[in-house]
Amino acid sequence: MSRHINTFLIVLTAAVLGGCRNYLNVQPQGEVIPSTDEEFASIIHNRLREIEGGGDEYVIGNMDALKHLEGCADDLDANIKTSASLTFFAGEEITARQRAYEDSWEIVRDCNIVIENLSGRDSDIAKGSLSAAYAMKGIIYYNLIREFCQPWSDTDADELPGIPLVDRFSISDKPSRGTLRQSYDYASAQFESALALDPTDPKYIFTTWIVKAYEAKLDFWCCKWDKVISLCEDIISNSGISLTPIGEYAAMINSQYERKGEVLVRSHINNSSELDWYFSFTKGYLASRPACAALIRLFGDEPKKDVRYEASFDKKRMNVKTPECKVRLSEIYLMLAEAYCHTGQTQKSLDLLNELRRNRIEGVVDYTESTLPSVREGDRIVVDCYGNALTPLMQAIFDERRKEMYMEGDRWYELKRNGRPVWWVISNGLKYTTDSYLYTSPISKSDVDLNPSLIQNPGYVY
């Protein structure tokens, strides 16, 4: 649960969290340690129900996760309007991000319990639960790498601090942080273990193509372009999912509960979730700040020809797009287009970009190398993930990504991945600067206090 839901449900949440923290020490209270496949499966299904109901912030994510990410990024213009209900500065979120670090480990703990006890069992329940446990653990590590590690660097990955590599939990263990490269390898191994079990049962959510999509996202973040190309080509060619066409886009992107069209996976598919009342407030918070002019300008002189425009904004530039965390085929296209661009396969990159645009913009004319818009001056992102100045093709990919992934929690990580630009917001006469170090959240201070071998991230001194 988020800190906001905790405020409303403090008594219930305290009881739940109390139970979570004592999960590995239940015998003194007279509880029964799980032993059967069904009992271990229930641990996984509790986590899957959180995803379906919208309560999960740390695997697929929910509206609370989006509220943090979209509030701290620059797609919404905090210089025009700020409010207490919607964050506008990452520095305000330091305590909440430490709590996110702690809560993520509770999910890893549950996954490890299932992995340790169901490995080698051959029932359908055991294999389904085990594959879901590996998949969720891999996704958690991917999310921890994005949030709590510095951006990927091929030259520094063996020295940069990563995430503790935890196969099992013990009260006496105090694991230190692995390197960034070790963390990538560990997360990748979780996805491979999930895929080795041939996950096909949708009731465990994380079926083959969904696992491959998250593995591609991990490889994309860590600049493994050959792997990105292999995985994304496989998904596009063999998953049976295709880009949602213009006429069906609005219904797909603003579906309240259903997974429609090109969506591989999304949160909050339970239309009787007990959290719906809370999310109605969250939607209002996200619609309380107008989109920034730089984003709106990307839609050109005739913005309504781009189906994404009216599906995202009202006449006052306020958000109307349904804020749900999801993975869509359009993201796979964009990752593949960028991977081709980084590997010098310009025409393949252009072909993918043009195919996406034809499914979004009425009457659009395909780009060629000679007709790509020149690189603009004054944009926030001016370099790619290697620190190289943007080319017209890379800028075009970034522009489509910004329009396509608006209000899906992507922009903050694009800023982090591509240069960590420093920028500021004025509120109530004060200047709030997003410095480069703020793109990487601090690991939990309480963890550092308990385990001095844990290295805190740069910029945070307690």
Model-derived features: positions:
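Sec-dependent bacterial lipoprotein signal peptides
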Residues: 1-20
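Hydrophobic-face positions in mid-chain alpha helices that act as interaction patches
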Residues: 223, 227-330, 362-384, 394-396, ...
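Aromatic- and glycine-enriched pocket-lining scaffold segments that form the walls
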Residues: 198-229, 233
